[in-house]
Every structure is written in structure tokens, then in C-alpha cells.
Amino acid sequence: MTTTSFISNVRARALSTTQKLDWLGPLVARITLGVLFVSTGWGKVHSLAKVTAYFSELGIPFPGIQAPMVSFIELIGGALLVIGLASRIAALPLMGSMAVAILTAQRENVHGLPDLFGLVEWTYFALLLWVALAGPGKISLDHVLFGRNRAENKSRSLGPEFSGKAV
């Protein structure tokens, strides 16, 4: 066996294995984010006075409205992510919450892209963007109730040059 054929064989086996496990990444990311947001939302719901005062200190407009709204967005959105129901929709307000957190609570800590990319809020935003665009994955209520997710659909809107198949 030549070195080239050995490498090709190893590559083919690795690709086959990773394709069989392609459901794991979205599941772990979605559940991790969901549990995190359920936890922070629950904490905020049960400490609304403190959250409202903190939002007021940050200069967030209408803190008496925003604090409960963000609390329930995190609690309900996180729960939806955990079970994989309406995941793409749930990710959007959570992304908004992370964007506001970056622009208010973390604003003074960001002096460039390395600082931004070092924020946990940015990591959550990026993972939520992935869920919003790629969907919740095969192990989700969305998949059970509505069938194939976007990642499994053929790229109808992008045309044949992006479908991965030769034209």
C-alpha cells in the first residue's frame, strides 16, 4: 500500500465516521446554550429588582420593562433550545440580548476584535447565529415535527454551483 492510498483510506474512514456523528455538534451546542439561558433567565426572573437596578445603571432604556422581558426571553428561549422546538426563532431574541449585553455591560472591555472575540457573550452570539442559520439538528422536536432541517435540504436557493454536486 502506498502512502497516498493509506492517507486516502484514513481520510475516507474519518470522513465516514464524522458524517455518522454530524448530529452531535448541533445537539451539544443547542442543549449547552439552552441550559445556560434557562439558568440565567431563572435567576433574573427571581431577582427582577436587582436586574432592573443593574439595567438602570447601564443606561438601558425602560429598565422596568426590559428586565422582565430579557428574563423571560432567556428562560423561555433557553427552554425551547433545550427541547429543540422553534430553535431558529428562539435564537433570534437571544442573539439580541447578547448584542445588547456586549454594547452595554461589556462596551468598555472591547477595544478591538480580539477583545470582542474573547467575550463569552460573543461566543453565545456566534453559537446562536449558527443555530438560527443551520437549525437545531436531527435530534430535536423541530426535526421530528417538521422533517428535514436546512442543513439536510438541498441548496435550492443557492443554485447547483453550491449544492456540492457537479453540474
Stretch-by-stretch model annotation:
Residues 1-46, 64-72, 76, 83-167:
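Extended, low-polarity transmembrane helix blocks
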Residues 48-60, 88:
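Short juxtamembrane and helix-loop transition motifs at transmembrane-helix boundaries
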